[in-house]
Amino acid sequence: MRLMIAAAFASIALAQSELPYHVVPDWAKLPAGWNFGECSGVAVDHNDNVWVFNRGPHTLIEFDRNGKFLKALSEIPVKSSHGIRVGPDGNLWIIDVAGHKMLKLSPEGRVLMVIGGVGDAPADNDSPDGFNRPTNIAFAPDRSFFISDGYVNSRVMKYSKNGDFVTKWGRKGKGDGEFDLVHDVVFDKRGRLYVADRSNERIQIFDQNGKFLGKWTNIGAPWGIDYYAPEDSIYMVDGRNDRMVRLNMEGQITGTLGSHGRAPGKFFYPHSIAVDSTGAIYVAEIRNWRVQKFVK
Protein backbone atom coordinates (compact mmCIF):
# COMPACT_ATOMS: atom_id res chain seq x y z
CA MET A 1 0.00 0.00 0.00
CA ARG A 2 2.84 2.40 0.72
CA LEU A 3 3.87 2.40 -2.94
CA MET A 4 0.36 3.42 -3.91
CA ILE A 5 0.50 6.69 -2.00
CA ALA A 6 0.20 9.62 -4.37
CA ALA A 7 1.99 11.81 -1.83
CA ALA A 8 0.10 14.94 -2.78
CA PHE A 9 0.02 16.54 0.66
CA ALA A 10 3.45 15.30 1.69
CA SER A 11 5.03 16.64 -1.49
CA ILE A 12 3.53 20.05 -0.95
CA ALA A 13 4.65 20.10 2.68
CA LEU A 14 8.22 19.01 2.00
CA ALA A 15 8.87 20.67 -1.33
CA GLN A 16 10.19 23.90 0.24
CA SER A 17 13.19 22.08 1.74
CA GLU A 18 16.28 22.98 -0.29
CA LEU A 19 18.74 20.19 -0.97
CA PRO A 20 22.07 20.83 0.79
CA TYR A 21 24.11 20.97 -2.41
CA HIS A 22 26.10 23.66 -4.18
CA VAL A 23 27.30 23.79 -7.75
CA VAL A 24 30.95 23.29 -8.71
CA PRO A 25 31.53 26.13 -11.21
CA ASP A 26 33.16 25.23 -14.54
CA TRP A 27 33.50 21.62 -13.48
CA ALA A 28 34.12 20.02 -16.90
CA LYS A 29 37.52 20.96 -18.39
CA LEU A 30 37.15 20.53 -22.14
CA PRO A 31 40.17 20.75 -24.45
CA ALA A 32 40.85 24.19 -25.93
CA GLY A 33 38.37 25.06 -28.66
CA TRP A 34 35.94 22.27 -27.77
CA ASN A 35 32.36 22.63 -26.66
CA PHE A 36 29.43 20.41 -25.84
CA GLY A 37 26.29 20.33 -27.91
CA GLU A 38 22.92 19.62 -26.33
CA CYS A 39 23.76 17.37 -23.37
CA SER A 40 21.15 14.63 -23.41
CA GLY A 41 22.71 12.07 -21.08
CA VAL A 42 25.18 11.68 -18.24
CA ALA A 43 26.36 8.55 -16.42
CA VAL A 44 29.04 7.56 -13.92
CA ASP A 45 31.13 4.40 -14.09
CA HIS A 46 32.52 2.17 -11.34
CA ASN A 47 35.50 4.50 -10.88
CA ASP A 48 33.23 7.54 -10.59
CA ASN A 49 34.42 8.77 -13.96
CA VAL A 50 31.72 10.72 -15.77
CA TRP A 51 30.48 10.08 -19.31
CA VAL A 52 28.68 12.88 -21.16
CA PHE A 53 26.50 11.93 -24.14
CA ASN A 54 25.85 15.02 -26.24
CA ARG A 55 24.84 16.27 -29.67
CA GLY A 56 28.04 18.16 -30.39
CA PRO A 57 31.03 17.16 -32.54
CA HIS A 58 32.41 14.84 -29.83
CA THR A 59 29.54 12.52 -29.04
CA LEU A 60 30.84 10.76 -25.92
CA ILE A 61 33.29 12.47 -23.58
CA GLU A 62 34.83 10.98 -20.44
CA PHE A 63 35.99 13.04 -17.44
CA ASP A 64 37.30 12.08 -14.04
CA ARG A 65 35.34 13.16 -10.96
CA ASN A 66 37.29 16.43 -10.80
CA GLY A 67 36.38 17.35 -14.36
CA LYS A 68 39.70 16.44 -15.96
CA PHE A 69 39.24 15.45 -19.61
CA LEU A 70 40.15 11.80 -20.19
CA LYS A 71 39.04 10.98 -23.71
CA ALA A 72 36.39 11.43 -26.37
CA LEU A 73 34.66 8.94 -28.63
CA SER A 74 33.74 11.08 -31.61
CA GLU A 75 32.92 8.48 -34.27
CA ILE A 76 30.00 6.77 -32.57
CA PRO A 77 27.39 5.67 -35.16
CA VAL A 78 24.37 7.54 -33.78
CA LYS A 79 21.98 10.02 -35.36
CA SER A 80 20.96 11.77 -32.14
CA SER A 81 22.14 11.08 -28.61
CA HIS A 82 19.70 10.47 -25.77
CA GLY A 83 20.17 8.23 -22.72
CA ILE A 84 23.28 6.53 -21.37
CA ARG A 85 24.08 4.09 -18.57
CA VAL A 86 27.26 2.30 -17.61
CA GLY A 87 26.30 -1.35 -17.27
CA PRO A 88 27.34 -3.78 -14.54
CA ASP A 89 29.88 -5.09 -17.08
CA GLY A 90 31.56 -1.67 -17.26
CA ASN A 91 30.49 -1.12 -20.85
CA LEU A 92 28.60 1.89 -22.18
CA TRP A 93 24.97 1.39 -23.14
CA ILE A 94 23.64 4.28 -25.18
CA ILE A 95 20.36 5.17 -26.87
CA ASP A 96 20.18 6.67 -30.36
CA VAL A 97 16.75 8.27 -30.26
CA ALA A 98 16.56 9.25 -33.94
CA GLY A 99 18.11 5.99 -35.12
CA HIS A 100 15.65 3.95 -33.01
CA LYS A 101 18.38 1.77 -31.51
CA MET A 102 20.44 0.82 -28.47
CA LEU A 103 24.20 0.37 -28.72
CA LYS A 104 26.49 -1.41 -26.27
CA LEU A 105 30.03 -0.05 -26.51
CA SER A 106 33.31 -0.90 -24.87
CA PRO A 107 34.92 2.05 -23.05
CA GLU A 108 37.19 2.32 -26.09
CA GLY A 109 34.19 2.74 -28.39
CA ARG A 110 33.96 -0.69 -30.02
CA VAL A 111 30.37 -1.71 -30.80
CA LEU A 112 29.53 -4.91 -28.91
CA MET A 113 25.75 -5.14 -29.39
CA VAL A 114 23.02 -3.39 -31.36
CA ILE A 115 19.27 -3.72 -30.80
CA GLY A 116 16.78 -1.99 -33.08
CA GLY A 117 17.51 0.41 -35.89
CA VAL A 118 16.88 -2.10 -38.67
CA GLY A 119 17.04 0.06 -41.77
CA ASP A 120 16.56 2.98 -39.37
CA ALA A 121 12.82 2.23 -39.55
CA PRO A 122 10.80 2.66 -36.36
CA ALA A 123 8.79 -0.20 -34.88
CA ASP A 124 5.20 0.10 -33.72
CA ASN A 125 4.03 -0.41 -30.14
CA ASP A 126 3.19 -4.09 -30.69
CA SER A 127 6.48 -5.08 -32.30
CA PRO A 128 9.10 -7.02 -30.31
CA ASP A 129 11.80 -6.21 -32.87
CA GLY A 130 12.62 -2.54 -32.48
CA PHE A 131 11.79 0.88 -31.09
CA ASN A 132 10.27 4.21 -32.02
CA ARG A 133 12.35 6.99 -30.46
CA PRO A 134 13.60 5.09 -27.39
CA THR A 135 15.02 7.00 -24.44
CA ASN A 136 17.10 5.08 -21.86
CA ILE A 137 18.07 1.76 -20.29
CA ALA A 138 18.19 0.17 -16.82
CA PHE A 139 19.77 -3.02 -15.46
CA ALA A 140 18.15 -5.55 -13.14
CA PRO A 141 20.24 -7.43 -10.54
CA ASP A 142 20.44 -10.47 -12.87
CA ARG A 143 21.81 -8.19 -15.64
CA SER A 144 18.71 -8.38 -17.76
CA PHE A 145 18.00 -4.92 -19.11
CA PHE A 146 14.98 -2.75 -19.74
CA ILE A 147 14.58 -0.04 -22.40
CA SER A 148 12.10 2.82 -22.21
CA ASP A 149 10.41 3.25 -25.60
CA GLY A 150 9.73 6.17 -25.78
CA TYR A 151 8.62 9.37 -27.46
CA VAL A 152 6.28 7.64 -29.94
CA ASN A 153 5.77 4.15 -28.56
CA SER A 154 4.53 3.95 -24.98
CA ARG A 155 6.10 0.88 -23.43
CA VAL A 156 8.96 -0.79 -21.58
CA MET A 157 10.95 -3.56 -23.29
CA LYS A 158 12.75 -6.31 -21.34
CA TYR A 159 15.78 -8.24 -22.67
CA SER A 160 18.00 -10.98 -21.29
CA LYS A 161 21.59 -10.08 -20.45
CA ASN A 162 22.54 -11.46 -23.88
CA GLY A 163 20.10 -9.19 -25.69
CA ASP A 164 17.27 -11.65 -26.32
CA PHE A 165 13.76 -10.19 -26.17
CA VAL A 166 11.81 -11.35 -23.10
CA THR A 167 8.65 -9.27 -22.75
CA LYS A 168 7.12 -5.82 -23.07
CA TRP A 169 4.30 -3.84 -21.52
CA GLY A 170 2.52 -0.53 -21.83
CA ARG A 171 0.44 1.52 -24.22
CA LYS A 172 -0.41 5.18 -24.57
CA GLY A 173 -2.78 6.44 -21.89
CA LYS A 174 -3.18 7.72 -18.36
CA GLY A 175 -4.18 4.50 -16.57
CA ASP A 176 -1.97 2.34 -14.39
CA GLY A 177 0.62 0.66 -16.60
CA GLU A 178 -0.03 3.12 -19.42
CA PHE A 179 2.37 5.86 -20.44
CA ASP A 180 2.70 9.18 -22.21
CA LEU A 181 6.35 9.66 -23.15
CA VAL A 182 8.35 6.99 -21.34
CA HIS A 183 11.52 8.99 -20.72
CA ASP A 184 13.75 7.11 -18.25
CA VAL A 185 14.03 3.91 -16.19
CA VAL A 186 16.05 2.89 -13.13
CA PHE A 187 16.12 0.08 -10.53
CA ASP A 188 16.32 0.32 -6.76
CA LYS A 189 18.18 -2.12 -4.49
CA ARG A 190 15.02 -4.23 -4.10
CA GLY A 191 14.84 -4.92 -7.83
CA ARG A 192 11.86 -2.64 -8.45
CA LEU A 193 11.74 -0.71 -11.72
CA TYR A 194 10.92 3.00 -11.69
CA VAL A 195 9.60 4.45 -14.94
CA ALA A 196 9.62 8.18 -15.67
CA ASP A 197 6.21 8.77 -17.27
CA ARG A 198 7.14 12.26 -18.39
CA SER A 199 4.04 13.79 -19.97
CA ASN A 200 1.76 12.17 -17.38
CA GLU A 201 4.00 13.81 -14.74
CA ARG A 202 4.43 10.75 -12.57
CA ILE A 203 6.75 7.87 -11.81
CA GLN A 204 5.30 4.36 -12.06
CA ILE A 205 6.79 1.36 -10.25
CA PHE A 206 6.82 -2.24 -11.56
CA ASP A 207 8.30 -5.61 -10.81
CA GLN A 208 10.62 -7.18 -13.37
CA ASN A 209 7.75 -8.89 -15.17
CA GLY A 210 5.79 -5.69 -15.68
CA LYS A 211 3.40 -6.06 -12.74
CA PHE A 212 2.22 -2.63 -11.63
CA LEU A 213 3.20 -1.86 -8.03
CA GLY A 214 2.39 1.80 -7.59
CA LYS A 215 2.79 5.37 -8.78
CA TRP A 216 4.03 8.70 -7.51
CA THR A 217 2.19 11.84 -8.58
CA ASN A 218 2.40 15.54 -7.72
CA ILE A 219 6.16 15.45 -8.22
CA GLY A 220 6.61 17.52 -11.39
CA ALA A 221 7.65 16.18 -14.78
CA PRO A 222 10.29 13.42 -14.49
CA TRP A 223 12.70 13.87 -17.38
CA GLY A 224 15.61 11.98 -15.82
CA ILE A 225 15.87 9.72 -12.74
CA ASP A 226 18.62 7.95 -10.83
CA TYR A 227 18.66 5.87 -7.65
CA TYR A 228 21.11 6.52 -4.79
CA ALA A 229 21.27 3.41 -2.62
CA PRO A 230 22.99 4.89 0.49
CA GLU A 231 20.02 7.23 0.95
CA ASP A 232 17.42 4.87 -0.55
CA SER A 233 16.24 7.83 -2.62
CA ILE A 234 15.35 8.67 -6.19
CA TYR A 235 16.91 11.81 -7.63
CA MET A 236 14.96 13.37 -10.48
CA VAL A 237 15.27 16.30 -12.85
CA ASP A 238 11.96 18.04 -13.44
CA GLY A 239 12.33 19.54 -16.90
CA ARG A 240 9.05 21.42 -16.82
CA ASN A 241 10.02 23.34 -13.69
CA ASP A 242 13.81 23.41 -14.27
CA ARG A 243 14.75 21.88 -10.93
CA MET A 244 16.25 18.86 -9.21
CA VAL A 245 14.04 16.80 -6.88
CA ARG A 246 14.79 14.14 -4.27
CA LEU A 247 12.09 11.57 -3.46
CA ASN A 248 11.89 9.02 -0.67
CA MET A 249 10.49 5.53 -1.18
CA GLU A 250 6.96 6.73 -0.39
CA GLY A 251 7.11 9.16 -3.30
CA GLN A 252 7.39 12.19 -1.04
CA ILE A 253 9.53 15.13 -2.09
CA THR A 254 12.26 15.53 0.52
CA GLY A 255 14.09 18.38 -1.16
CA THR A 256 14.46 20.43 -4.32
CA LEU A 257 17.17 22.56 -5.85
CA GLY A 258 17.41 25.02 -8.71
CA SER A 259 15.22 27.15 -10.92
CA HIS A 260 15.15 28.39 -14.49
CA GLY A 261 18.21 30.20 -15.77
CA ARG A 262 21.64 30.08 -17.34
CA ALA A 263 23.87 30.98 -14.38
CA PRO A 264 25.74 28.24 -12.51
CA GLY A 265 23.30 26.29 -10.36
CA LYS A 266 20.33 27.19 -12.57
CA PHE A 267 18.76 24.88 -15.16
CA PHE A 268 17.32 25.13 -18.65
CA TYR A 269 15.74 21.82 -19.71
CA PRO A 270 17.60 19.48 -17.35
CA HIS A 271 17.39 16.16 -19.18
CA SER A 272 19.45 13.54 -17.35
CA ILE A 273 20.83 12.99 -13.85
CA ALA A 274 23.46 10.70 -12.32
CA VAL A 275 24.64 10.25 -8.73
CA ASP A 276 28.13 8.90 -8.03
CA SER A 277 29.31 6.75 -5.12
CA THR A 278 30.11 9.80 -2.97
CA GLY A 279 26.68 11.38 -3.47
CA ALA A 280 27.89 14.00 -5.96
CA ILE A 281 25.19 14.76 -8.54
CA TYR A 282 25.62 15.46 -12.25
CA VAL A 283 22.89 17.08 -14.34
CA ALA A 284 22.92 17.23 -18.16
CA GLU A 285 21.05 20.11 -19.76
CA ILE A 286 19.65 20.42 -23.25
CA ARG A 287 19.35 24.19 -23.64
CA ASN A 288 22.42 25.21 -21.63
CA TRP A 289 24.72 22.75 -23.42
CA ARG A 290 26.47 21.65 -20.24
CA VAL A 291 26.75 19.17 -17.40
CA GLN A 292 26.80 20.63 -13.91
CA LYS A 293 28.22 18.97 -10.81
CA PHE A 294 26.67 19.46 -7.38
CA VAL A 295 28.26 18.51 -4.05
CA LYS A 296 27.36 18.93 -0.39
Question: Where do the PLM segments sit?
Answer:
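Eukaryotic scaffold repeat domains enriched in small/polar residues
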Residues: 16-296
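Sec-dependent N-terminal signal peptides
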Residues: 3-12
